């Protein structure tokens, strides 16, 4: 709701008819909000039912929880965090460092996006960047620069030592250094 209001206020600087069109679209979206929530909950229920299927391996469970995380992430922080915690337990059970790293990166990004910067910083500190795959390094640099940007942007009191803005640029440059134009990233 707050974002809608902010958007509406920012639109007042431009054309009045464009502003009215945006307000109409926002009103229409709000009218259908319950439908959107119901559709999201149905999709989540379908994915959750896959967890109860016979013969689901731990690796399959990990990937099902990944699907749940993707659905919950923009929808419910607590549920998204819970699915990541379950993924991490499974990744540890099957002794997959790679899956553990992926999950930890998702946790750091989730906490950053939600504004839990202290928690995100602690999670980043737990990740052994030397053992990340190339795709994971790209994700780490991207997540870390987003963390630094958001932290500098939204936090007025500094309880985390944040490097200057040039560190964000260094992370972006590092992504360009370790990737090539013809290399697909997952």
Regions picked out by a protein language model, each given a short descriptive name:
Residues 1-10:
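Bacterial N-terminal signal peptides
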Residues 11-186:
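A "functional boundary" signal
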């Amino acid at each position: 709701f707050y974002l809608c209001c902010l958007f509406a206020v920012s639109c007042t600087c431009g054309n009045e008819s464009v502003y009215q069109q945006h307000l109409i679209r926002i009103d229409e979206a709000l009218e259908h909000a319950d439908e959107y929530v119901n559709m999201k909950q149905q999709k989540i229920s379908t994915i959750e039912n896959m967890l109860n299927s016979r013969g689901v391996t731990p690796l399959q469970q990990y990937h099902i929880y990944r699907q749940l995380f993707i659905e919950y992430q923009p929808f419910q922080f607590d549920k998204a965090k819970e699915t990541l915690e379950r993924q991490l337990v499974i990744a540890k059970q099957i002794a997959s460092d790679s899956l553990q790293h992926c999950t930890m990166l998702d946790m750091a990004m989730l906490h950053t996006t939600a504004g839990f910067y202290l928690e995100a910083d602690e999670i980043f500190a737990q990740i052994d960047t030397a053992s990340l795959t190339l795709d994971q390094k790209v994700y780490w640099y991207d997540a870390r620069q987003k963390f630094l940007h958001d932290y500098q942007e939204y936090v007025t009191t500094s309880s985390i030592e944040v490097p200057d803005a040039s560190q964000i640029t260094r992370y972006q440059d590092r992504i360009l250094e370790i990737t090539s134009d013809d290399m697909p990233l997952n």
